[in-house]
């Protein structure tokens, strides 16, 4: 009897410990998938934003395709991009889940109007979990704040990789390797150079991530209601899941694309400023100076350089990343729920 009890305790303990780890792994996989597939769009965005000619997309594409190694040229910078997006997504999703779960567990609905938090019971997900995901369902205000905080924290940790990615993708620098780029930056700009543009990045990422989560969750609810779909949760039976057209994945994918398009349009000026500061820190120095110079030299249009590319890439990357992440987490939640039921059945 004691052995059975000990096994039960071990299983529950491993379940609690595995959840943050799996959120990290799911975020890493989703980030790697989207970054590798969409690297050409990210490279083109960087090249377009570095130019004072905001309509330089076609010449940039022709230049790359005319090079001796066009395929390699389109995927230049894949390694730093994959590292940044992969581990950045892992840190972001893990932090976001931790924050949202903590908010839901403390039941702060009276602080965040419309919140539906509640304490987890018996090791299961909080009752505030949305039907379309394993994440807690919060109010718009709570979604905005948790999304912004999680993104800025992950962005700070990954900022050196982001700077290396931007410099390596740009044709302003002739770096032969990432290690060579890192040594050159530290030699000429100090460690501070590895964090160039963090202010603009934080100001871009905080509202983007917050708005994205708000738009994403609202879009999922609206689409599910409009299409009459009840997306499967960890507690759904196989029969109930078969009666859920369209699938959870399709709702999450469409919602991710729509949310990214809206959030990207609103925050694009910050992205352009960030790119200029990271590429030419000696000229632009900081966000305020960069914005003033860009408006004086190139006009308002310069703040929306690369918008089409960024919107297309963000829509696809966010839709892919969030769909893969949500599906992996829901799969894991179902497996953990089944394990708990099996253990209870044995006991």
Swiss-Prot record:
Ranges occupied by Solcar repeats: 18-102, 138-222, 247-331
Task of the protein: Mitochondrial glycine transporter that imports glycine into the mitochondrial matrix. Plays an important role in providing glycine for the first enzymatic step in heme biosynthesis, the condensation of glycine with succinyl-CoA to produce 5-aminolevulinate (ALA) in the mitochondrial matrix.
InterPro entries from the UniProt entry: Hem25/SLC25A38, Mitochondrial_sb/sol_carrier, Mt_carrier_dom_sf
Membrane topology listed for this record: Multi-pass membrane protein
Pfam families, per database record: Mito_carr
Main location: mitochondrion
Superkingdom assignment: Eukaryota
PANTHER family in the cross-refs: MITOCHONDRIAL GLYCINE TRANSPORTER
Compartments, record wording: Mitochondrion inner membrane
GO biological process, one term: glycine import into mitochondrion
GO cellular component, one term: mitochondrial inner membrane
Catalysis performed (reactions): glycine(in) = glycine(out)
Protein name from the UniProt record: Mitochondrial glycine transporter
């Amino acid at each position: 009897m004691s052995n059975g009890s000990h096994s039960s305790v071990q299983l529950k303990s491993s379940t609690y410990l595995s959840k943050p780890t799996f959120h990290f792994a799911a975020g890493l996989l989703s980030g790697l998938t989207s970054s590798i597939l969409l690297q050409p769009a990210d490279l083109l965005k960087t090249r377009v934003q570095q130019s004072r000619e905001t309509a330089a997309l076609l010449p940039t594409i022709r230049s790359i395709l005319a090079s001796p190694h066009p395929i390699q040229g389109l995927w230049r910078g894949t390694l730093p991009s994959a590292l940044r997006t992969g581990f950045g997504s892992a840190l972001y999703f893990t932090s976001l889940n931790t924050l949202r779960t903590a908010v839901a567990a403390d039941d702060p609905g009276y602080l965040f109007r419309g919140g539906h938090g509640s304490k987890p019971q018996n090791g299961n997900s909080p009752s505030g979990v949305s039907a379309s995901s394993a994440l807690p369902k919060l109010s718009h205000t709570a979604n905005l704040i948790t999304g912004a905080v999680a993104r800025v924290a992950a962005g700070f940790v990954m900022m050196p990789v982001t700077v290396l990615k931007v410099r390596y993708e740009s044709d302003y620098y002739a770096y032969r390797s990432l290690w060579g780029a890192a040594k050159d930056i530290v030699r000429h700009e100090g460690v501070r150079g590895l964090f160039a543009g963090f202010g603009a990045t934080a100001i871009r990422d905080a509202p983007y991530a917050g708005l994205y989560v708000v738009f994403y969750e609202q879009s999922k609810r609206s689409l599910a209601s409009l299409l009459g779909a009840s997306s499967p949760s960890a507690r759904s039976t196989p029969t109930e899941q078969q009666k859920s057209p369209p699938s959870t994945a399709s709702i999450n994918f469409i919602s991710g694309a729509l949310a990214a398009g809206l959030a990207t349009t609103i925050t694009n000026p910050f992205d352009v400023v960030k790119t200029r500061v990271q590429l030419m820190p000696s000229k632009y120095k900081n966000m305020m100076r960069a914005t003033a110079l860009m408006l004086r030299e190139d006009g308002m249009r310069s703040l929306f350089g690369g918008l089409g590319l960024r919107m297309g890439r963000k829509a696809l990357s966010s839709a892919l990343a969030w769909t893969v992440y949500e599906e992996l987490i829901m799969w894991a939640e179902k497996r953990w729920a089944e394990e708990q039921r099996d253990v209870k059945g044995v006991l």
